[in-house]
């Protein structure tokens, strides 16, 4: 398999460079990416150390390294450009056009996107995260009715991380409820969920994927057997069908895509701004 080295550079956390860079790299199959991360590059000495690493790796591999950057310092960027690399500069790609359109120079202050602004949206996110934790796995039935959306599914379908992401990114009050073997008699909603049917959103998985996830946690158990996973998923998916519960198969879908789909299909867009 073809291998390429790729660097993610930032003068702050590096989250933006990594997220955008990864989104681009996933469009190319058959390549093993050797990833290197350098965050908080806030001095010439740190930048020089990274440049030396880039040049060393490029020489070893006989090809330029790929570099995704959100650096704002023009002097530091100029130094990186002289390294043996192909530079993808996310900020410069857009800032020049924005400057021309807005007729205003950018501030070029690192970390502005991560500054905590204590407005209504900020406080809603904090409250939503606390709600997601308090209502995890249907733990607090008394607050379930407060949810904007209730994510349902059998064990190990990814409900908890989705709810936390919905809270963190969108400020959505997301509860989750796990279907257990005790629920799986007749095809009917558990009594607790019956009055909340309109708030439900289902997660499902391919049987082989669910078995793999469960096997990692409880190897060799009945809970992790293919037959049990198949039985639970068949019951769950029929429940979704009969009660017209919107759902998404998460087998090959990222948590970001799952969450965006829930926000869109459950018509929760406006709530991400605290309204």
Curated annotation (Swiss-Prot):
InterPro entries: Kinase-pyrophosphorylase, PSRP. One of its GO terms (molecular function) is ADP binding. The keyword Nucleotide-binding applies. It is an enzyme of class 2 (transferase). It catalyses: [pyruvate, water dikinase] + ADP = [pyruvate, water dikinase]-phosphate + AMP + H(+); [pyruvate, water dikinase]-phosphate + phosphate + H(+) = [pyruvate, water dikinase] + diphosphate. ADP binds at residues 153-160. Its EC number is 2.7.11.33, 2.7.4.28. Keywords: Kinase, Nucleotide-binding, Serine/threonine-protein kinase, Transferase. NCBIfam families: PRK05339.1. Bifunctional serine/threonine kinase and phosphorylase involved in the regulation of the phosphoenolpyruvate synthase (PEPS) by catalyzing its phosphorylation/dephosphorylation. Belongs to the pyruvate, phosphate/water dikinase regulatory protein family. PSRP subfamily. PANTHER family: PYRUVATE, PHOSPHATE DIKINASE REGULATORY PROTEIN 1, CHLOROPLASTIC. This is Putative phosphoenolpyruvate synthase regulatory protein. It comes from Nitrosomonas europaea (strain ATCC 19718 / CIP 103999 / KCTC 2705 / NBRC 14298).
């Amino acid at each position: 398999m073809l291998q390429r080295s790729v660097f993610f550079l930032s003068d702050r956390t590096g989250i933006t460079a990594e997220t955008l860079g990864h989104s681009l790299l996933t469009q190319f199959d058959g390549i093993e990416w050797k990833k290197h991360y350098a965050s908080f590059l806030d001095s010439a000495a740190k930048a020089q150390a990274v440049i030396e690493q880039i040049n060393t790796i490029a020489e070893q591999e006989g090809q330029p390294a790929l570099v995704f950057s959100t650096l704002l310092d023009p002097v530091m960027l100029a130094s990186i450009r002289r390294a043996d690399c192909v530079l993808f500069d996310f900020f410069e790609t857009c800032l020049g056009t924005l400057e021309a359109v807005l007729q205003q120079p950018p501030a070029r202050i690192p970390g502005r996107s991560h500054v905590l602004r204590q407005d209504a949206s900020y406080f809603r996110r904090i409250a939503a995260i606390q709600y997601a934790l308090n209502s995890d796995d249907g733990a607090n039935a008394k607050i379930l009715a407060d949810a904007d959306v209730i994510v349902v599914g059998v064990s190990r379908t990814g409900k908890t991380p989705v709810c936390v992401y919905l809270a963190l990114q969108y400020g959505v009050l997301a509860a989750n409820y796990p279907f257990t073997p005790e629920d799986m008699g007749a095809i009917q909603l558990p009594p607790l969920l019956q009055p909340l049917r309109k708030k439900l959103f289902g997660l499902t998985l391919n049987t082989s994927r669910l078995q793999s996830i469960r096997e990692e946690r409880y190897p060799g158990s009945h809970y992790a057997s293919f037959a049990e996973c198949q039985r639970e998923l068949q019951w769950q998916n029929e429940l979704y069908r009969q009660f017209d519960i919107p759902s998404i198969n998460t087998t090959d879908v990222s948590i970001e895509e799952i969450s965006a789909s829930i926000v869109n299909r459950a018509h929760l867009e406006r709530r991400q701004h605290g309204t």
